[in-house]
């Protein structure tokens, strides 16, 4: 009986930890899509990297790795917020890597027009975080963009 009671007390703690990680990811994504360096830079680890891959039907894939410095400079040059759709909390999946690290992934769908044709644009986003100095820092970030003609 004591074991059941202990488990009932532990389940909300585990659920709250997962919700907190979802909030960490959503805050990170919002700062990234804001293109505001003052919001985004403090969330990044020293060696943060981002890699974006475009998957174009009938053509192939192209991956662009970008350093932290390159990304922040690009944000400074174009500080206008992105119009890309934001992730919803219910679409964020958390993967615990260790006591100090986790990764969060999400998916968004949008419709875009390219060369006069309508496409579905699906983004698979993943960011990994490390807990350091009482906060989470993003250590890596990948975005896979898939297009499908409608």
Predicted segments, located by residue:
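Positively charged n-region of N-terminal signal peptides that target proteins for export
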Residues: 1-4
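Generic short beta-strand segments
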Residues: 49-51, 106-112
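Hydrophobic/aromatic beta-strand elements that line small-molecule binding cavities or substrate pockets
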Residues: 71, 89-95, 108-110, 122-131
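Short, cysteine-centered beta-strand-loop-beta hairpins and adjacent loop/turn segments enriched
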Residues: 81, 110-120
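Short beta-strand edge/turn micro-motifs at domain boundaries
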Residues: 101, 118-150
């Amino acid at each position: 009986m004591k074991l059941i009671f202990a488990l009932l007390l532990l389940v909300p703690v585990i659920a709250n930890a997962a919700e907190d990680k979802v909030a960490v990811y959503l805050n990170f994504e919002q700062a990234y899509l804001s293109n505001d360096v003052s919001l985004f830079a403090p969330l990044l680890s020293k060696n943060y990297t981002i890699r974006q891959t475009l998957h174009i039907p009938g053509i192939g894939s192209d991956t662009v790795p970008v350093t932290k410095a390159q990304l922040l400079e690009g944000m400074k040059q174009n500080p206008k917020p992105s119009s890309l759709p934001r992730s919803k909390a219910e679409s964020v999946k958390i993967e615990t890597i260790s006591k100090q690290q986790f990764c969060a992934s999400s998916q968004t769908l949008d419709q875009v027009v390219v060369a006069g044709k309508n496409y579905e644009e699906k983004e698979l986003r993943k960011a990994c975080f490390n807990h350091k100095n009482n906060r989470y820092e993003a250590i890596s970030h990948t975005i896979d963009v898939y297009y499908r003609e409608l």
